[in-house]
Design a protein with these regions (language model features):
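Active-site/ligand-binding surface loops and adjacent short beta/alpha elements
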Residues: 128-130, 137-208
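Extended, loop-rich substrate-binding clefts of extracytoplasmic carbohydrate-active enzymes
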Residues: 63-113
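Beta-strand-rich N-terminal accessory domains
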Residues: 1-59, 191-208, 245-258
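Active-site pocket scaffolds in enzymes
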Residues: 201-258
Length: 258
């Protein structure tokens, strides 16, 4: 997809992920083994021991990050292309085993000259179930593989979810601490995080949602992950998808040259 000098590559067959985002020929998303931006659904981050409850029923998910289950079931699956144009792609995925409920995920990726807007929804036509939506981008720490100044992160969260030794929130909210981070933060007025590559580009990640995970412990990448709830949220803060009320979320990456 193209808009002005912005170009985005979408990979329906590889988890419905954004494979690359180039602005003026400069790649903003990490390439290689962990790359692009993948959707996290029907949960974000880790579920404790891979188990979540829906009423009296306990469901077990595969432990793909032992001892926990991480990042949902769709990031390696093949999505269907419902519609595509020069600057917008609409993808769908029907939830299947190991997720215990039937439902449909729809993702819309829309490119403008100065922004990329991501929208996702989860619908059910049968049983209600808890779910989460999020995105996991791998932004390049430095642009063009250079040795210049790395991306600087600026945001003003209201709190930080205290992280336990098991990498999951303890349930305590604490004052935000300095990085490096692999942590979830609360932004009750909406997510607003700015990445700045000094002298090159500023990219602002915004969303009406209230939780964002910031992960900058890797040398080559910085992750800013908007999501509809905290890690382990299927257990601690479930949001129900019902036949009358789908779960919906949106996030925007807007950039400007410096």
């Amino acid at each position: 997809m193209t808009a002005g000098d912005a170009e985005a590559t979408v990979l329906p067959g590889n988890g419905g992920r954004i494979g690359g985002l180039r602005v003026g020929g400069t790649e903003l998303l990490r390439q290689g083994e962990r790359y692009g931006c993948f959707p996290m659904v029907p949960w974000c981050g880790r579920i404790r021991d891979g188990r979540f409850s829906d009423g009296a029923v306990v469901h077990q998910m595969p432990l793909n990050s032992p001892p926990h289950a991480i990042h949902g079931t769709v990031r390696d699956a093949a999505w269907r292309t419902a519609r595509v144009s020069g600057n917008e792609a609409v993808l769908t995925y029907d939830l299947v085993d190991p997720w215990p409920y039937t439902g449909r995920v729809t993702q819309v990726i829309a490119l403008a000259e100065d922004a990329l807007t991501l929208t996702m929804s989860v619908e059910t036509y049968e049983s209600s179930f808890p779910a989460q939506i999020g995105w996991h981008p791998w932004f390049n720490r430095t642009l063009d593989g250079g040795s210049g100044a790395g991306a600087e992160i600026a945001f003003d969260p209201a709190w930080q979810e205290e992280r336990g030794d098991d990498h999951l929130p303890t349930g305590n909210r604490v004052e935000p601490k300095p990085g490096p981070w692999d942590d979830c933060f609360g932004m009750p007025d909406g997510i607003d995080v700015t990445l700045t590559w000094p002298g090159r580009l500023e990219l602002r990640v915004t969303s009406p949602e209230q939780w964002v995970v910031v992960y900058d412990e890797q040398e080559a990448a910085v992750c800013v992950e908007p999501q509809t709830g905290p890690p382990n949220g299927l257990n601690t803060l479930p949001r129900l998808v019902t036949p009358l009320e789908p779960l919906e979320a949106t996030a925007t990456w807007a950039w400007r040259r410096l």
